[in-house]
Amino acid sequence: MMNHEHSQGIIELGNINIKCLIFKINSNDILEIQSTSITQSEGIHNGVIVNISKATNAIRSCISAAEKKAKSSLKKINVVLEQPEFLCTKFSKHKKIDGSKIHKDDIEFLLKEAKKQVMLNDEKQSIIHIFNHNYIVDGKTFIEEPIDVYADYLSHEMTFVTMPKNNLKNINKAFIDCDIEVERLISCTFALAAKLLNNNELQFGSILIDMGYEKTSLGLFKNLALVHSITFPVGINHIIKDISNICSLNLEESKIISDKIDFSFQNNKELFDKNDYLKDIYFKNSNYRRISQSLILDIAKARLDEIFEMIQKQIIATGLNPTLGANLFILGGSNLFNLEKYCSNFFGSNVKKLDKNIEKESQGELDTQFASCLGALKIIKDGWETEAIPELVDENSQKLGFFAKFFQNKP
């Protein structure tokens, strides 16, 4: 249960920055964001602690700065992250009802069996999230719990998100060294969807692609549930490094070029001269030589195609097809110009580019910089009706359905 009137914290562990947000909810359920802070990330790569000492110092610095602004001290904190090592597994459990009513005990049995199977399948994994996808009653799909419905057969489809226990131990260790306890972990993909997608988009089917600096994350949502997610350890920086390696340019020059590319590939006159060679102004430190437009654009296309092909395989495997009505969104965190147009051409569907300050009532820089934290705040404050492990979500929340309540305060 959420502690009202006490300051609570959310921290996002990113590759470039660590972000902390401290908030408070009073007895009237009114939210107050007390402070935020951003510090440079160290000792963390793609959500994984790779250097305990550096990560601890960076985390401590970020939390301390936020605590100082909020004039409060945190004992626990919610951690937002995304790792390529996250595993997303879909389970379907079945039970014979034999013409009787479906009771809560029947659903509880299926939930327990699924959770038990996940833990037995890989003892080295820890469960981060469980989502209810849907129920199948005598061949018919039910979105909500089919309590008191007469049936012969009940199936329950669930999605489990897990992470390696050793990764979790290292995260806990870093925060313990900061004298703070991890309250819960929240997938960054889930948090971004909670912040940026509306109820209809989450209900009827959406695909969210978040292209980051060192990784690309994919989340597929339907019936208000995360039905599939995966993170690939390849991102925008790989385009920069490809240009650098193949064209013998330094990384600074390659980044400037990457940022200037029009990914609709219709107009790149800013980069190239009338003979279609890279303009000399982009050779900041390297010696000028002829580098053709086709070479640079082919390098960028090849890396993008590699990323999108991996994503396409995942989408096809789940059956959530953007050409058949599912919404497809790409996050603008990478800031590649006209990336959504190339994405639309690749997937054969209209792709919408999301800005992290998409809401019209945006709080400006707060929404832009802290979209993941604000999404996590929404999940923590209101609960998520299809999520099964919000043990620390306010039990008075109206959005906390039976599926969530079942796991509340259970091991």
What are the residue ranges of the model-derived segments?
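A short, acidic, amphipathic alpha-helical segment used as a generic capping/interface helix at domain edges
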Residues: 306-317
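Acidic-glycine-rich active-site phosphate/pyrophosphate-binding loop
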Residues: 32, 212-214, 342-359
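Nucleotide/phosphate-binding catalytic cleft detector across ATP-hydrolyzing
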Residues: 1-17, 21-76, 80-207, 225-227, ...
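Phosphate/oxyanion-binding active-site loops and adjacent basic polyanion-contact surfaces
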Residues: 51-55, 300-307, 369-373
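Glycine-rich phosphate-binding loops at beta-strand->alpha-helix junctions
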Residues: 16, 263-266, 323-346
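Acidic, glycine-rich loop-and-beta core segments that form the ion-binding/anion-interacting portion
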Residues: 197-270
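Glycine-rich phosphate-binding/hydrolytic loop that grips phosphoryl groups
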Residues: 353-401
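Short, charged, surface-exposed secondary-structure boundary motifs
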Residues: 46, 195, 241-244, 360-366
